[in-house]
From Swiss-Prot:
GO cellular component: cytosol
Binding-site residues for Zn(2+), renumbered to this chain: 83, 180, 208
Protein name (Swiss-Prot/TrEMBL): D-tagatose-1,6-bisphosphate aldolase subunit GatY
Keywords on record: Galactitol metabolism, Lyase, Metal-binding, Zinc
One Gene Ontology term of the molecular function aspect: tagatose-bisphosphate aldolase activity
InterPro entries: Aldolase_TIM, Class_II_FBP_aldolase, FBA_II, TagBP_ald_KbaY/GatY, TagBP_aldolase_GatY
Superkingdom as given in the UniProt entry: Bacteria
Amino acid sequence: MCVVSTKQMLNNAQRGGYAVPAFNIHNLETMQVVVETAANLHAPVIIAGTPGTFTHAGTENLLALVSAMAKQYHHPLAIHLDHHTKFDDIAQKVRSGVRSVMIDASHLPFAQNISRVKEVVDFCHRFDVSVEAELGQLGGQEDDVQVNEADAFYTNPAQAREFAEATGIDSLAVAIGTAHGMYASAPALDFSRLENIRQWVNLPLVLHGASGLSTKDIQQTIKLGICKINVATELKNAFSQALKNYLTEHPEATDPRDYLQSAKSAMRDVVSKVIADCGCEGRA
């Protein structure tokens, strides 16, 4: 097994009526949890990293880890650039071996968004790299980028088709009421908008900001065309809270191989639930 593109993963999901979860990882332990759980459940998953994660861990290191784990667990894995904004940064990582990219120019006016995304698509497709882009903008914080709720806006269905055709992207991230981070109360997702987008666009659709969504809402979005579900904050929260609890209860603990186990276990529960919600168990 090897590192693969997400294009075939998402096309399979679109045909099969399920979604592939993209889990944001931050270090060796969080990657281990995702890969081990996915392998045990025979589920397709995407290993996602923001620019901050790639800076923290190193592109070559992350690629080597994903490749090694794909072979160790005999499980196909994709490593994905999440919310990357700079062409040169994306190009360097693609040349290093990354085969799935999200170029996020959603903060730009429509025409400039198209122009920026098309530049990345034209480059990436030369390397058989799949490209995701976003139309509309989610509120909340992702890495060090903060978008106020007042500045967030939903995806326009008619523009979505123009955007997809003009850029040549492989998947489209939509804004239908989710936000980055955890929710203080259940969000009101615009399912009718999503259904309308699906009628205008034949590409696999992507939902960001899925941390904390109910099983019912996730499964409804999948029925309406979502093929990729992004989860980040919920993983971090489970991992960090379990770690804090363990160290509070065991102040004498000094061995990371011991005190990280409870954190991994808590995160594993979240990964397992998301895989179940996505309906992708046994689909790898």
